[in-house]
Every structure is written in structure tokens, then in C-alpha cells.
């Protein structure tokens, strides 16, 4: 995959997300290598937990932690690693880990991909149980890894998500 050919935004309202980890997959953390285009196994998670959403990043962005902007894509199905999915941001999970701030944009597929998410405009439109599962996952997925920790500090709205995305794009430009 030639990541340099994939834009961060499909248009003013949609982002492109490269999936690294499918929802409900085994306890394996994958990472996309930008230079080779390969997906590497980053580590086998010591907890037997699976990601509650598809997990990936926005190409050509840089977040505060030095990595591309992270995105959780809410969907009804797992998406194959390496796939590019067009999404709309609806909010952000604010958290910190042993390395510092580590925000996660929450997004849904565009209407062209799945009309069942058309009514989701903000985080408040998502099911409360899904939001609880997301928090639970991130609060505990590193529990058995020595020296690692996560603290979820709250949720922010779509405006904050859009701001973080634009800041991430600006850091690369």
C-alpha cells in the first residue's frame, strides 16, 4: 500500500481511516509500517480482550504523542487490516497513558458505506453501552503489561474531534 497516495480527508466532512485492528479480533495489536506498507504484529496483548471497534489512524496526521491521529470506527462488522474506510468524526475519547496524552477519535462510516449510521451526529447519539465498552477496554487492555497504564479522562464532542484532526494535519503540513 502506498500511504502517500491516501489523503487525510476525503472532503471537508469525511476522513480516511486506515484500519490496523478489526473489531472483535484476537488480543493482538497490529501496527501499520508507513515506510514498507506492511502491517506488523506490535505485540500480543496479555489481557484476553478484543477491540470493541475497528481501530486505525488518519494518514498524513501527527497527534501529540508523535503517532498519526488514532481513530475508533464504530461499525457492525470487522474491517480487514490495511483497508481504507471513509468516516465521519462524531467525538473523541480523552485519555492518558504511560507516554502522555493519547486521544482516540470516534467515527462512523459515511452514508455511502452504511446508512444505518446516518442518525449518529455526535457522541450522545451512540449507545451508552458501546461507550461503556470502549472505556472499559481502554482502562483495562494494558492491565497485565508491566509499566503500562491507561487513564480515561472523559469524552469530548465532534468539534473537539474536528479540531484534533485539523491540528494533526497541520503538524504534517
UniProtKB/Swiss-Prot annotation:
CDD domains linked to this entry: pyrophosphatase (cd00412)
GO biological process, one term: phosphate-containing compound metabolic process
Principal EC category: hydrolase
GO molecular function: inorganic diphosphate phosphatase activity; magnesium ion binding
Entry's EC annotation: 3.6.1.1
Catalysed conversion reaction: diphosphate + H2O = 2 phosphate + H(+)
Keyword check for Magnesium: yes
Record's GO cellular component terms: cytoplasm
InterPro entries tied to this protein: Pyrophosphatase (IPR008162), Pyrophosphatase_sf (IPR036649)
Cofactor(s) in the UniProt record: Mg(2+)
Localization terms from the record: Cytoplasm
Domain of life: Bacteria
Family: Belongs to the PPase family.
Assembly description: Homohexamer.
Physiological role: Catalyzes the hydrolysis of inorganic pyrophosphate (PPi) forming two phosphate ions.
HAMAP family per record: Inorganic_PPase
NCBIfam families recorded: PRK01250.1
Record's protein name: Inorganic pyrophosphatase
Amino acid at each position: 500500500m502506498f500511504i502517500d497516495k491516501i489523503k487525510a480527508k476525503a472532503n471537508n466532512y469525511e476522513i480516511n481511516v486506515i484500519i490496523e485492528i478489526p473489531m472483535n479480533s484476537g488480543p493482538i495489536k497490529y501496527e501499520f509500517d508507513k515506510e514498507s506498507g506492511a502491517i506488523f504484529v506490535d505485540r500480543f496483548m496479555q489481557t484476553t480482550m478484543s477491540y470493541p471497534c475497528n481501530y486505525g489512524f488518519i494518514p498524513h496526521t501527527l497527534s501529540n504523542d508523535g503517532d498519526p491521529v488514532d481513530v475508533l470506527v464504530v461499525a457492525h462488522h470487522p474491517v480487514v487490516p490495511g483497508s481504507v474506510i471513509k468516516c465521519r468524526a462524531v467525538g473523541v475519547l480523552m485519555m492518558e497513558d504511560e507516554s502522555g496524552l493519547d486521544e482516540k477519535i470516534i467515527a462512523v462510516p459515511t452514508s455511502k458505506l452504511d446508512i444505518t449510521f446516518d442518525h449518529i451526529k455526535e457522541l450522545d447519539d451512540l449507545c451508552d453501552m458501546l461507550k461503556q465498552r470502549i472505556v472499559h477496554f481502554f482502562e483495562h487492555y494494558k492491565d497485565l503489561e508491566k509499566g503500562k497504564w491507561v487513564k480515561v479522562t472523559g469524552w469530548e464532542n465532534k468539534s473537539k474531534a474536528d479540531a484534533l484532526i485539523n491540528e494533526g494535519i497541520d503538524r504534517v503540513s
